[in-house]
Curated annotation (Swiss-Prot):
The gene is pvadh. Belongs to the bacterial PQQ dehydrogenase family. The keyword Oxidoreductase applies. GO terms for molecular function: electron transfer activity; heme binding; metal ion binding; polyvinyl alcohol dehydrogenase (cytochrome) activity. It comes from Sphingopyxis sp. (strain 113P3). Its cofactor is pyrroloquinoline quinone. SUPFAM superfamilies: Cytochrome c, Quinoprotein alcohol dehydrogenase-like. Optimum temperature is 37 degrees Celsius. Residues 1-32 form the signal peptide. Residues 42-159 form the Cytochrome c domain. Catalyzes the oxidation of polyvinyl alcohol (PVA) in the polyvinyl alcohol degradation pathway. This is Polyvinylalcohol dehydrogenase. Monomer.
Amino acid sequence: MGSHAWGGAVFSAATLIAFGSVVHASGTVAETAPQSGHAVPADQLDGETLYKARCAACHDNAEGRTPSREVLSKNPASFILASMRTGAMVPMAEGLTLEEMTAIARAVGKADAKTDDGIDLRRIWGNSVEGTPLDAPQCSSAPTPVDLGAANQWNGWSTEKDNGRFQRKPALDVADIPKLKLKWAFQYPGSKNGQATVIGDRLFTTSTSGAVYALNAKTGCVYWRHAAEGATRTSPVIAALPEGAPAKTALFFSDFTKAAVALDAETGKQLWKTVVDDQPALQMTGSITYWDGKIYVPISSGTEAFAQIPTWECCKFRGALVALDAATGKILWKRYTTEQEPRPFKLNKAGRQMWGPSGGAIWVTPTVDEARRLIYVGTSNSYTDVPYDNSDSVMAIDADTGAVRWTVQLLADDNYIDGCWQKGKEHANCPNPLGPDFSIGAAPIYRKMADGKEFLLVGQKSGMIYALDPANKGAKIWERQLSLGSALGGIEFGTAADDGKVYAGVSDIASQAKDRGKPGLWALDIRTGEVAWNFLNAPDTKCRWNNWWCHGAFSQAISVIPGAIFAGSYDGHFRAFDTATGKIIWDVDTGTKAVTTLSGAKAFGGVMDGAGPTIAGGMVYVHSGYAGRSSESGGRDLRGTDGNILMAFSVDGK
């Protein structure tokens, strides 16, 4: 699912980034080849020769969203080194010593600021935040204890385990929405972040720099900051621990060290860390779900990008869901999205062994059906010609045992690798035929109506939205085509539902249509699938950033309260719509004018994508400036004022 890694300049949309798509945190080095006892110092190595041997094949002939060398050169050498050590390029850097990686980084990147001799890993922008100044003032007084009974909360990806993203108690009247004004803005380190979680007076959030923050929800001051050992973009979830545990409440997240992590929610101290899988190209994108003493961790992959490299051994990854004991971090069960283990099936055009089946990544946050004790997930496309039985599927998994109770495949044979759609290029690992990359990127929504009728609502990058029957093994109740879809949606991150309607944001940024599709927001009757209203946004909108990402796409997750729905779009506009009519109630441009952040710096918002609005305690929190797409480099220079900011709105800014 190429959509869940951030993009670069004016690149076509069907691709994951092959370099630096995630920025990892910590000076802790991920596993690489053993270091020689007689390593040659980096300053004695020819970084240019090493680059040509290991990197040029992709970056000198950049395709899709793979950044060109010119784009890479705008980044500090430390960022490039971090990508090879602990980031998305770890598989590509296999066998290189630290000195060789450093030589490549110096040859390609620009000199780092604020370093004395060589590269100071303690000051990597986008790498470890440890030892750097806080991004907002420290709170002057201690917080009250974390109260999971607080009325004002939004805990994790959604307010409830059904993933409806429906805040029933927002402490915000629809009549007051036009009076919302910016109260404070917090500039994240890193290029992306997890959605904010609010519990009482605490706000918890994560970033791809590895920074996990606890802020005051009303003022934005910092209670604590934890430096994780890897990039994280998942939404924190908070839960009580059993008596005798080392903390009363825990904060759970996953990171790109292939691990689930628990922190003491009061202090940020790490309680445990468990590596949940060790497959090649593994990523952690979907947020964790906590329920009944367990956490459920979805596993996704960057295989589509890495497989562009002819010498990369494609493809061994299988998506999975892992259940852990929340108190101890012990793995209770792991369910791959197919029972078939990848096996050798042919040599690619470069003579490398190919494996299959492979694919079925889980990009979404797991959904809980409490009555049936089932976990629902959506899966991604497959990567090879070998059929993958549960690709582009909805799966119902037993919450206690991990057994698969039923599956519904929405699209078969969606076999996809980045760059393969470009004609005239040699691609060693391309499946035949090539699929459209129509993964399920939005978490399934479980909704039980007042009369007991049940629905499982599923949006897909194909532009389709489905209502399945959870009481009848996922049988289709209705389906509706909202757009032609694309590798970046169609429906990407964003669906939400109240008690009568389901709402879907349509991206269409990568649409093959000449007019770049019909981005917008749709409202449908949950029972029938009939369209109640839709809002179409101009694809050729104007933005401060003059690049391919200036588009009217509604890709970011959306959120609903009684009477209003909040949605951000690629053009930087954050809007509230009347749920009955679709009329715009409120519209703020987050990307045109710089705002003063809590650190005192000026920063811009911009492209709105990924994790969506959090609404709690009469305030609305949303991030703007996703992945640097609204900067001059279109997503590669992570420093400066072009995002990535968390904006907190309140009535009259009070």
